[in-house]
Structures are given as structure tokens and as C-alpha cells.
């Protein structure tokens, strides 16, 4: 793309604009390539303006900056390079958001689950759908790992372009508060913006200085979308939609909502844990959700409300929710016996308490929790996780997680400090593969077993190296060896 064409996306100042073709947009000088435009971003730990010369020496054809920099190539000045990168990226990749329906989801909890519920419903209706979020970028059989829930705006545009080229009609995106703060989703309009809930999180450090800023960042989505889907049961919802510019559609248990949930009940059969509830208001039907926990009624109702606005048939909503699966989030793994085996990402005391409390409500014969703890992380997490599992599980199976540079036995010793505060039973099997084998071989009818900690991860980190370790593959290998 010609530089002059690219720059039509932003306001800028320059003595001259060379007649050059731009091969890529780059904001990390280490990734500069011949013919690229290097955009100087200020981050929490580094300032891209200091690396402009390095980028030019590696072949950058032009530097885009907020202030004059020393470089042997033309320098284009603009007021906010982070915002400029968003608009430049949209132009460079051909405005992919205008070629499909883009849905953004924000909230403290529930973004990932709601995103996958949306995907399951939309694909049940015959619409190819991509997802950008915590688990990475997913469309078709393609899964790309990412570092952040909401990637940098250049990556967001690149991934959306890939989705359009792959035939996606919809893109469902988790939109974090930091992503909004850093303009990672600027440069396009969301068709829908979904709000799940709001509670204290991400305060301090390089994130948000206080709750007011956190809420203000969340609220930005509702000035960037055409229609907002809002949980009116959340006491903070009025702050979230303050100064909104979109249409508002509401959901919740509150009878004044446009879409109302009621009559929820837990559903269980061997290998299946879920929840059933009724929807009234603008639609009237019953939904079965293939993810356990009454709190998932909110996530499902959010997805239902959004899909109704998109004119998706109720039958597709029902099919999608009944078959939804979120990798690593209370993910069921088919078993030959009359017990339930789940994989979950719970890796701290809060998330472990949530998942074990949820599963306890299904009245299992035994609730077995297999878990470890990350190495080179605060020891207090291990104490707390041991105490939570000891109090809530009938049996804890403690094993390795990502031990990193620590000895697994030292980590397990710390977990046992927490277990010792309870009357909970436990066994210790340091090898995670063997711990999984033990759980399967010793399962009894009616048991619920949760393998906690790894979730969607497909590796184990030991002594600085990541070794392949996908629990789904491990389980399949164990079952094959038992035949």
C-alpha cells in the first residue's frame, strides 16, 4: 500500500511524504522489516521513540511518532501514535470489520464463556464465526495463541482480515478494559457491545489506578457500538452505559428486562453437567446449557439476547447452547464409565473455590480435585489452594503443574500446608500424567473429577522449557492403554 494512501486514515504533520510502498506496520523495532512503517508506541516499560533509529537501520521506510526522533528516514508526526496505529491498521488491512458482523464482549467475568456460547449459536445457525479472546484466535480449525485477551490493534485488524478471507461472517471478541484504555479496538464500529458484569479487578500497577477508571474504560465500548446488550441486574450497569451513544437492549432476572430468565435448574447425567432455564419477555422458550453452574444462566441469556437482535432463530440458540464447549473451562471429556471428568483452568484459590462450589451443587458421589501450583509464584497461593480443595473436595490429588524452576516436591509441600488446615483427604502423585491415570482408574460411578490448572494450555513448563502436554491427548492415550 502506498504511504500516501495509508496516511489518509489519520491526521498528521510531515515535511514530506515519500512515494513509497509500505510492506507492513510494525511497533516492535525487533520485528522491523524492509519497507515497513515503524510506529513509536509508549508502553509501561519501554518507549518506542527510543528505538526509531534501530527500526530504520533494519529497513523501516518511515517512522510515525508523537515527537521528533533521530532517524535516517522520513518522520511523520501525529498526536497519539497508539490511536493512529488503530486507524492505520484498519486502512492497511482493508477495513475487515466492515465485511463481517463484529461483536464485542466486556465485563469482569464471563467474557470467554459468553463468546463461545455466541460462536456455538451462530455456527448452529450456519454462520462461520471467529473468536478473539483469552484462549487465542479461533476460526475454523485454526487456533493462534496470543499474549493478551485483547491483542494490540494491529493484530486485531490482521486477525479480522484472516477471518474474512477464511469466509467468516461473524467475529466475536473479548474486549478487556486495558484493551479499551489502550485503543486496541479503535478504528471500527462494533455491531453489538455486550456487558456481562462488573466487580473489582485489574486495579493497580500498569492497569487501572482505581475503580472509577476501570468502569470508565469498560463504558467506552458503548460509545463504539450500534447496540448495547446490558445486564440490568448488575448494580453498576448505569455507570457502564453512562454517556452511551448506542441503542440499549437489556437482560436479567429483573422482570423489567427485555429478556428475562427464570426457573433455572441443574441438569446432570453421566458425562453431562448443565443448567436449564426459561426465557420470557421478547422471546419465550426453554434452554439447556451444556456448562454447569447457575451463574452460566447470565452468560447464556446474554448470548440469547445478542443473537435475538441479530435475528438468529430460537432453534439455533437451543442447539448451540446444548452443545457449547469452552476449551479448558469446565470442559467435559467423554469417558467410558458412569463418572464425569472435567478439565478446568482454575489455578488460584478464588477460581478453585468457584468451580468446586459449582460442582458440589450437583451432589456427586465423590468430588475429586486434581491440581498443582505454578513454580516461581507466591507461596501463599499454594497454601490457599490446598485449603480450598481440602475443604470442598472429597479427595485432593496433588501433582505437578508448571513447576518452572522449582522442584515439584517443594511445591507440593507448600500445598500440603494448606491441606493440613482441613480434614480433607489427599494423595500425592508428582507426575501429572500418572495422577490423571490414577483418577481415571480409580473413578467410581457418580464421581465428578476435575483436572484443575491447565485448562486450555497444551504444555508443561519445566526448567525454562515448554513440553507438549495437552490433557485431552493424555486422557486419550491413557484410555487407549487401558483397552
Predicted segments, located by residue:
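Phosphate-binding loop of NTP-binding sites
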Residues: 85-232, 236-246, 301, 362-363
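N-terminal leader/targeting and accessory segments in enzymes
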Residues: 1-87, 91, 223, 264, ...
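ATP-dependent carboxylate-amine ligase
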Residues: 1-13, 34-37, 245, 282, ...
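A short, gly/pro- and small-residue-rich
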Residues: 48-64, 75-84, 191-196, 212-216, ...
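Short glycine-rich anion-binding loops that position phosphate/pyrophosphate groups of nucleotides
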Residues: 43-45, 177-178, 199-201, 234-235, ...
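Acidic, Mg2+-coordinating active-site environments of NTP-dependent enzymes
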Residues: 4, 9, 65, 69-72, ...
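A short acidic, helix-capping loop that chelates divalent metal ions and anchors anionic groups
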Residues: 71-72, 139-143, 200-206, 377, ...
Amino acid at each position: 500500500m502506498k504511504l500516501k494512501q495509508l496516511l489518509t486514515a489519520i491526521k498528521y504533520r510531515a515535511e514530506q511524504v515519500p512515494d513509497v510502498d509500505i510492506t507492513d506496520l510494525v511497533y516492535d523495532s525487533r520485528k522491523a522489516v524492509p519497507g515497513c512503517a515503524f510506529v513509536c508506541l509508549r508502553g509501561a516499560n519501554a518507549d518506542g521513540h527510543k528505538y526509531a533509529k534501530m527500526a530504520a537501520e533494519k529497513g523501516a521506510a518511515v517512522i510515525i511518532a508523537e515527537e521528533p526522533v533521530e532517524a535516517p528516514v522520513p518522520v511523520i508526526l501525529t498526536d497519539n501514535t497508539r490511536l493512529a496505529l488503530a486507524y492505520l491498521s484498519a486502512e492497511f488491512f482493508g477495513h475487515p470489520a466492515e465485511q463481517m458482523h463484529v461483536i464485542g464482549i466486556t465485563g469482569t467475568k464471563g467474557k470467554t464463556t459468553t463468546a463461545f456460547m455466541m460462536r456455538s449459536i451462530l455456527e448452529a445457525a450456519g454462520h462461520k464465526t471467529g473468536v478473539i479472546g483469552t484462549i487465542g484466535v479461533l476460526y475454523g480449525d485454526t487456533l493462534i495463541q496470543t499474549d493478551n485477551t485483547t491483542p494490540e490493534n494491529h493484530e486485531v485488524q490482521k486477525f479480522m482480515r484472516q477471518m474474512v478471507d477464511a469466509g467468516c461472517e461473524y467475529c466475536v471478541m473479548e474486549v478487556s478494559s486495558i484493551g479499551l484504555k489502550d485503543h486496541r479496538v479503535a478504528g471500527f464500529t462494533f455491531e453489538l457491545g455486550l456487558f456481562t458484569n462488573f466487580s473489582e479487578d485489574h486495579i493497580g500497577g500498569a492497569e487501572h489506578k482505581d475503580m472509577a477508571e476501570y468502569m470508565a474504560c469498560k463504558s467506552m465500548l458503548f460509545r463504539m457500538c450500534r447496540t448495547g446488550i446490558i445486564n440490568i441486574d448488575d448494580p453498576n450497569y448505569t455507570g457502564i452505559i453512562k454517556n452511551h451513544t448506542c441503542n440499549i437492549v437489556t437482560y436479567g432476572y429483573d422482570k423489567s428486562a427485555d429478556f428475562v430468565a427464570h426457573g433455572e435448574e441443574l441438569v446432570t447425567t453421566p458425562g453431562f453437567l448443565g443448567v436449564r432455564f426459561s426465557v420470557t419477555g421478547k422471546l419465550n422458550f426453554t434452554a439447556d446449557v451444556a456448562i454447569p453452574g447457575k451463574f452460566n444462566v447470565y452468560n447464556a441469556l446474554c448470548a440469547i439476547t445478542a443473537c435475538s437482535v441479530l435475528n438468529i432463530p430460537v432453534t439455533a440458540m437451543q442447539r448451540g447452547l446444548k452443545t457449547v464447549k469452552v476449551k479448558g473451562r469446565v470442559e467435559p471429556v467423554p469417558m467410558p464409565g458412569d463418572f464425569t471428568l472435567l478439565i478446568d483452568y482454575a489455578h488460584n484459590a478464588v477460581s478453585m473455590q468457584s468451580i468446586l462450589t459449582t460442582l458440589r451443587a450437583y451432589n456427586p458421589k465423590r468430588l475429586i480435585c486434581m491440581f498443582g501450583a505454578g513454580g516461581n509464584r507466591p507461596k501463599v497461593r499454594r497454601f490457599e489452594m490446598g485449603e480450598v480443595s481440602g475443604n470442598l473436595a472429597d479427595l485432593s490429588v496433588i501433582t505437578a503443574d508448571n513447576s518452572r524452576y522449582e522442584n515439584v516436591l517443594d511445591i507440593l509441600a507448600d500445598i500440603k500446608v494448606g491441606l493440613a488446615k482441613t480434614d480433607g483427604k489427599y494423595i500425592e502423585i508428582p507426575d501429572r500424567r500418572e495422577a490423571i491415570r490414577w483418577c481415571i482408574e480409580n473413578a467410581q460411578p457418580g464421581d465428578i473429577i476435575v483436572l484443575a490448572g491447565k485448562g486450555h494450555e497444551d504444555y508443561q513448563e519445566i526448567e525454562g522449557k515448554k513440553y507438549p502436554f495437552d490433557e485431552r491427548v493424555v486422557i486419550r492415550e491413557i484410555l487407549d492403554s487401558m483397552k
